[in-house]
Amino acid sequence: MSKQTVALSKNPLRLSGPAYGGDYNPEQWDAQTFERDLELMLESGVNMVSIGIFSWARLEPVEGAYDFDWIGQIIDRLHQVGIDVDLATGTASPPAWMANDYPESLPVNADGVRLGFGSRQQYCPSSVVYRERSRALAGALAKRFGDHPGVVLWHINNEYACHISECFCSTCRTEFQNWLGKRYGSVEQVNIAWGTDFWSQRYASLEQIDVPKAMPTFPNPSQRLDWRRFSNHQILGCMTGELEAIRKHSAIPITTNFMGGFPKLDYREWAQHLDIITDDHYPDPADPAGAWEIAWQSDVMRGLANGAPWLLMEQTTSAVQWRRRNSPKRPGQYALWSLQRMAHGSDGILQFQWRQSFRGSETFHGGMVPHAGKASPVWRDVVDLGQTLKNLAPVVGELNSSDIAIVIDWESEWALEVATGPAEHDSPFEGARAWHRTAWELGIATDVVGPNDPLDSYKLVIIPQVFIDRPELAAAAERVAANGGQVVVTAGSAVVDDNLGAILGGYLGSFKDLLGVQVVEHALLTGPDYLAAEADAERANQVNRLTRAVGTPAAETWLGLATEHEGLNVILGSIGEQGTDLRGGQWAEHVVATIQAGPTERADRDLPADIVAQGFAVAGLVGDAEIIATFDGRGGGVDLEGLPAITRRKVAAADASAKPGSAWYVATDLDCVSRAAFLRLVTAHARGFPVVAGLPDGVEAQRRGDILFLLNHSDKSVELNGIVGTELIFGQQCTGHVVIAPRSTMVVAP
């Protein structure tokens, strides 16, 4: 890939250096302020702004009557001074005339309440009027500005589904029925897929099916999963409708801004339609894990871009306004976190917004030009970063690379969310995030990929809690192992089919043969619910003669693990001053071998009769699956004592030129220390290494091509040795020993 070209997908956005700027709303200011803004933009190094994002009421003040002259004049002036435009379609916030003239376009919540006008995103994604008028506006803008030399990017809508991810109106009811008809072909197939004989939910026709609005108790989980799919489909249809309208008149690249691992929309499906992946992200400066949040979200975006660069569309220069308390970024953190995004693949740093609002719901959201203007230290940070980015032109277009992939699956997240059990799921991509953070803390670069993405180039693939059984993913994982790679599958994977039907005969579905094990029972810990209910359990148990004798290991929050694996024991012994132990969390499982054992090979413990009848072994896992760790009875694991907690199956090489690989199964959610120890073991088998070994606390290293980013997230200066090359920010030569100031970055080219 050539430098200075962001070949994110099908239609490259050409840049002379990193994009820098932000959302700009000149309609909120007078003409004098606009001219002053142009001066300040040039002073700060701004080369791109996004305009028109919430301008529908100005662009179409009366239905069908467009007023584009004002925005055309703004685009012309920006182009005259050399500032590119990311032109939005304005459709994120329909105007008052739509709400008043077409009240049916307003969304309805699950309780049947139609929401009102006066905020933003107040539209039903199935509304015929909204869809027609949004497509018409996008098409008219493209016809007018589709070949304007100052417009370099189309920006459809804004943060789809951030407020309204579903609507329960009568139009959506009809559209849901139509969608089901296309998906299943008949109402009887819907009945089969949803299991409607349960609780007498059978339907005689598609017209009987309602939206899953407020109900007396648990709704049908399969219906809710399809409702998630339908809602994603409807909102995606709004976006593709505008995209098609634009494409009739313009070849300029098209995007819509994502929000990281946002759980409501399947961004992997959405990304296929876009030319450029863009992201909005607002980590909390008060959160010590904020830097990791940036690494995670950036790696997700790069994965959506199929490994190519992407653009940061929104961040704040200082503080946001929407948290209960809003902390500003610390000195140096604005630049540090911006360059961290570039280290993870972004070719631009854009903000919300250019000039801080003085009215409205985002008055106290930070901007590049704060309320205090140039008197604010934020302004100096903005100018400094602009200069820094000018010096980083060689980074543009360079690619990240990794030998390790973590798989995420949006539909599995939906399935976990809507399933009635085994546990509530309120933390999206919890498993993937945990493994990604462990890799990041170890200094290991990772890619975040989807279940259908190619995996053959990776040495290690981690499949964490992919709840829906994916046969194609299992086959791809087996190829990785057969080519000498390592595959890790974790608890909670391959539990249900595509319609939330339980995998019968043992969980792990299509992965059973690869792993050599299957799950016969979930054994989750609930935490100290009962004890929390007793104000003073110790005092109460003086008289609760019966209750005090009852054992409740499930009230614990952790499980102890034991290992006889020499390599893992060595790693555990190296952690901390006196070594450490293995521990699991609240999700645990009964694991048995997938091949039959003879009577003498069965463990002497109580198991369900059907399992014993099939001859499944527990201890020893007869066959080619070996036990790496067992539950040792500590914490809440007394009933699991002796059962496998981590297993490994060696996989024969696909051909004589390949080395054998391994497939590992982790039957609990390891805590962060245990996860780190285990990942060190597995990466050693995969011959994976940190980007730069032996870095001090707080220092992150990432590579884009041959360019090395060194980011000091700590409050102390750090000294590094062995750093050789040209430091791009200041243009200095590094000859081995370097010092990086607190919350600062070095970018070194060979």
Regions found by a protein language model. Name each.
Residues L15-Y20, G45-N47, H79-V85, D147-V152, ...:
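Short, well-ordered coil/turn segments that N-cap beta-strands
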Residues M1-S50, P61, D76-Q80, D84, ...:
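N-terminal carbohydrate-binding accessory modules
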Residues D111-I276, D280-W296:
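Polysaccharide-binding and catalytic clefts of secreted carbohydrate-active enzymes
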Residues Y203-I209, K248, G260, A271, ...:
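Carbohydrate-binding surfaces of carbohydrate-active enzymes
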Residues G22, M41, V49, L78, ...:
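Conserved, mostly hydrophobic/aromatic
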Residues Q28-E43, S134-A140, M259-W270, R330-S338:
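Short, acidic/polar
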Residues A19-A31, G52-D69, G116-R135, Y160-S165, ...:
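The substrate-binding groove and active-site-proximal loops of carbohydrate-active enzymes
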Residues E35-E43, N47-R114, A142, G241-H249, ...:
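Aromatic-lined substrate-binding rim segments of carbohydrate-active enzymes
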